[in-house]
């Protein structure tokens, strides 16, 4: 991200990592067992149980208090698919996901719909592969709980992940600075 200022979250299959980020400085982070696969397993596939589990963990994440009014940066495949679905639903004209941004007031009702298991009824569901659709609701639950607690001004999505970040970190600093 170009000059990030907010809280970043990386949702994997087993965990959700949250950390404060400002420019090139990354603050201390926390890990919660809220990855899509793990959340689904812990809840026995129940969306209502998943919401309770996510709310319990997120309510303890004091780190999110520092994000109020800033940006939440969403990283991870399930969250990328939520962005892709939203882009299809609003008929977003560009096929560029990196730094795609949804204002908080728009993100909440969208995520609530997906978290209820209604993704199949959203225009644009065809953009998400069938084998990825089953985790959309669990990813939406985790993201919804995080942003409702944090109250960011918006959610911004990354087209890249940890792998790309690691490769970027291997570049010499002068080369890193040339890439916005």
Language-model features, listed with the residues they occupy:
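Ser/Thr-glycine-rich phosphate-binding loops at phosphate-binding pockets of nucleotides
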Residues: 12-17, 77
């Amino acid at each position: 991200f170009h000059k990030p200022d907010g809280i970043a979250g990386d949702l994997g299959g087993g965990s959700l990592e949250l950390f404060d980020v400002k420019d090139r400085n990354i603050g201390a982070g926390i890990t919660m067992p809220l990855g899509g696969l793990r959340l689904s397993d812990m809840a026995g596939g129940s969306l209502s149980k998943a919401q309770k589990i996510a709310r319990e963990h997120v309510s303890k994440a004091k780190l999110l208090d520092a994000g109020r009014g800033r940006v939440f940066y969403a990283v991870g495949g399930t969250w990328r698919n939520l962005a892709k679905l939203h882009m299809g639903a609003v008929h977003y004209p560009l096929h560029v996901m990196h730094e795609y941004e949804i204002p908080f007031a728009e993100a909440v009702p969208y995520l609530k719909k997906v978290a209820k298991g209604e993704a199949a009824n959203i225009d644009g569901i065809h953009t998400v592969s069938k084998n990825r659709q089953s985790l959309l609701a669990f990813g939406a639950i985790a993201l919804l709980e995080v942003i409702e607690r944090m109250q960011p001004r918006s959610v911004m999505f990354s087209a890249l992940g940890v792998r790309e970040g690691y490769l970027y970190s291997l570049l010499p600093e002068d080369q890193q600075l040339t890439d916005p």
